[in-house]
Structure formats: C-alpha cells, structure tokens
C-alpha cells in the first residue's frame, strides 16, 4: 500500500487486527483515535530510512502504524508510564515489523541521549498534558536535545479555538485530567527562539477537535 492512498479505514482495520486486549479505555483510544486525529498526514511526513522517535508514545500505536505504512530505519518510543511501555514492548515482540525498535522510560523533563540520534521526532497530543509550570522548560529541553538537521513534528490542540473545550471534555473522560493547551502561535515563537526553522504549519479541524501541526527543523 502506498502512502498516497492511505485512508483512516486502512489504519483502523490494521489496528483492530493487530492490537491485543489492553483494557477497555486503552482499546478505545488505540483503535479509534485515527477518526479524530490526523494520523494519515503525520504518517506521510516520514521519509524512507529515517530514524524516528515518538515522545509520549503510549502503547506504541503510532510507531506501529509507521512500521506498517512508512519506511523508517528504526523506531524509538519514550514514555513516562511503565505500564504503557510494557504494552508497547509486548505488542512489538509479537508482531514482526522487520524494523529495529526500542521503548524507554523517561522522567518527562530530561530527554534521553538517544534522542540526539533521531532524524524525525514526533510529539503528538502530548504537550497539553505536560504540567503547566513545566511546559516551557519541556519544550526548550526538547529543542536542545535535537541534533542539527533533525525535524520536530509537533501536533496538538489549538487553545485559540473555542472548540478547545471539546478536547478538555475528551481528556476528562479518557485521561482523567484537564490539559493546558497552547495556541499554535505561542509554540512557534518558542521554537523559533530556540533556533528552529518553521518549515510547515497548518490548522485542521476534525469533527470538534481543532488540531494544529508544526514541522520545525533544528
């Protein structure tokens, strides 16, 4: 299957047929998240043979999709929740991807040294879950942990849209917390202050969810 014809239906079919039972809530988030998040756009940003990392990788859903629908040379996931790391390792150990992979715990503030080896780093709907007092430090630390030439793909929910409250309700139901979303422009300002060049930026509403995506190069 080529990336040009990738559809949400392809992604959902793949997830339903590959994911083991991970609990009711986790299963909903894993198998049906592509309906409300622009995964097809994000997957197609990966270039052949890139070393790819996903920060806040959860149970490995997005990296599994990259192993199926893209052609990275390696996949690395970083996560603060050991239960989710176990989910991801169990998943990848039972599905032969033919791609080198690694899942690691981190403390949510200090990024592993291996991040400096990555060509492309994804941060997908994670930033608004970072504690408010730590968000700017988190973002600056992330920027300093990228190697020259690496690209950061930053996807989150736009606080400048009144529809942000639908995402807050979503997070209460599925995460048990209220996130702290930022406007896209605020994120761009921080990235530029840290010396990154913005090469792509766009907003996209899916149902009631006001997404934005930024691609920035170190």
Model-derived features: positions:
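N-terminal, positively charged/glycine-rich alpha-helical extensions of SAM-dependent methyltransferases
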Residues: 1-22
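Class I SAM-dependent methyltransferase Rossmann-like catalytic core
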Residues: 15-36
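Conserved alpha-helix/loop element of class I SAM-dependent methyltransferases that forms part
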Residues: 32-48
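Conserved class I S-adenosyl-L-methionine
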Residues: 50-58
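Class I SAM-dependent methyltransferase SAM/SAH-binding core
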Residues: 61, 65-110
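A conserved beta-strand element that flanks and buttresses the S-adenosyl-L-methionine
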Residues: 122
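A short glycine-rich, Lys/Arg-flanked "PGG" loop and its adjoining helix->strand segment in the class I
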Residues: 136-148
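C-terminal alpha-helical "lid/dimerization" subdomain adjacent to the S-adenosyl-L-methionine
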Residues: 153-194, 198-206
């Amino acid at each position: 299957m080529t990336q040009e014809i990738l559809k949400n239906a392809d992604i959902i079919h793949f997830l339903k047929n590959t994911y083991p039972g991970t609990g009711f809530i986790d299963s909903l988030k894993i198998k049906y998240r592509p309906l409300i998040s622009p995964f097809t756009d994000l997957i197609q940003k990966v270039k052949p043979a890139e070393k790819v990392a996903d920060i806040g990788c959860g149970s490995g859903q997005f990296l599994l999709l990259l192993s199926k629908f893209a052609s990275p040379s390696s996949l690395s996931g970083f996560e603060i929740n050991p239960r989710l790391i176990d989910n991801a390792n169990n998943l990848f150990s039972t599905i032969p991807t033919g791609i080198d992979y690694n899942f690691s715990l981190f403390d949510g503030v200090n990024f592993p040294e291996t991040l400096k080896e990555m060509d492309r780093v994804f941060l997908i709907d994670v930033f608004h879950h970072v504690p408010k007092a730590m968000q700017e430090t988190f973002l600056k630390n992330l920027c300093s942990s990228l190697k020259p030439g690496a690209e950061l793909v930053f996807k989150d929910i736009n606080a400048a849209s009144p529809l942000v409250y639908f995402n807050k309700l979503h997070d209460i139901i599925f995460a048990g917390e209220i996130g702290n979303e930022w406007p896209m422009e605020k994120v761009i300002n921080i990235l530029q202050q840290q010396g990154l060049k913005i090469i792509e930026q766009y907003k996209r509403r899916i149902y009631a969810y006001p997404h934005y995506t930024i691609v920035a190069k170190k």
